[in-house]
Regions:
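PP2C/PPM-type serine/threonine phosphatase catalytic domain
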Residues: 1-302
Length: 302
């Protein structure tokens, strides 16, 4: 009736990235375990618990960086789904995907806090050739991540998403996305009867066979949902899911030059959510924001 998973993808070099992801997983997992001891109270306030856990992990990362200067600049993504009977809650910061496989269709449930959605929109709008967009060096640059500073964007829906018996969830680091959605869909479908372990093993084998020299580290969890009294009235395209309100960012970033970004009013809602701006320090000065594998700063970066 109840369960959760916590996944974090670290960055900032091998050593610092490993520390960052361990801090996030340890803090969030511990908070969820502690708060869930009161089942009724936890279910009534899952969203606040998840956000508080993320804030706690972010503060711990800041404290660690202050006392260990060699890890300055480290950061980590976070995706943590919580399942209570047929209700799915989650918190997501960064680009680690949370996939749902239902009725032969794969869909990413959480927001992608990277420049990928911007670039894809520019390709669809004819502002960028498809091959350029597909291989764009900024595709994986993050617009939100845990780095011990203000969190730019948090995806944590107020209302739960309803699960159905037979649904399959895949929580992963972005290393899984070296496989196409079509490949992931095929593997999940072909191994669904074998359960979560069979799906996970086949995904790993496919990545090994791909043998991409640029392959990122990979971590994922596969969850197969089975319920005795499944509610057949809910589906992934229900108004309850489609109309959920997105969280407003506390601080916005300027990931690409303003003239290159389409007017949010003219963009689809899923893309327009990733708004642009400049992060400012307490003194009002524009400061760089550390994103995956590089500095992406308002003054051009390093």
């Amino acid at each position: 009736d109840f369960g959760y998973a916590v996944l974090s993808d670290g960055m900032g070099g091998h050593a610092a990235g490993d520390v960052a992801s361990k801090i996030v997983v340890t803090e969030v997992f511990s908070e969820l375990k502690f708060q869930s001891s009161d089942a009724d109270g936890f279910e009534a306030d899952v969203g606040s618990v998840l956000k508080n856990a993320a804030d706690s992990a972010n503060e711990c990362m800041a404290a660690h960086a202050m006392t260990n200067p060699q890890t300055a600049g480290m950061g980590a993504t976070l995706v943590a789904p919580v399942l209570i009977r047929d209700c799915l809650f989650w918190i997501s910061i960064g680009d680690s995907p949370l996939y749902l496989m239902r009725n032969g269709r794969l869909r990413q449930l959480n927001e992608d806090h990277s420049l990928g959605p911007h670039i894809d929109y520019m390709v669809r709008s004819g502002m960028m050739p498809e091959d350029v967009g597909r291989n764009h060096p900024d595709r994986n640059a993050l617009t939100s991540v845990l780095i011990g500073e203000a969190i730019e964007r948090i995806d944590c829906p107020d209302r739960p998403f309803r699960l159905k018996s037979g649904d399959i969830l895949v929580v992963a680091s972005d290393g899984l996305q070296f496989l196409s959605n079509a490949q992931i869909t095929r593997i999940v479908e072909e191994n669904a009867e074998g359960g979560s372990a069979a799906i996970a093993e086949t995904l790993l084998e496919e990545l090994r066979e791909l043998d991409d020299p640029e392959q990122d580290n990979i971590c994922f969890s596969v969850i197969k949902v089975e319920m005795k009294d499944a509610n057949k009235d809910h589906n992934i395209f229900s108004p309850e899911f489609e109309r959920r309100k997105s969280r407003s960012p506390r601080v916005t970033t300027r990931p690409i030059k303003p003239e290159d970004v389409p007017d949010p009013e003219e963009m689809p809602a899923s893309v327009a959510q990733a708004t642009n701006g400049a992060a400012k320090s307490d003194e009002g000065e524009t400061t760089p924001i550390f994103l995956r594998r590089r500095w992406l700063a308002t003054d051009g970066g390093a």
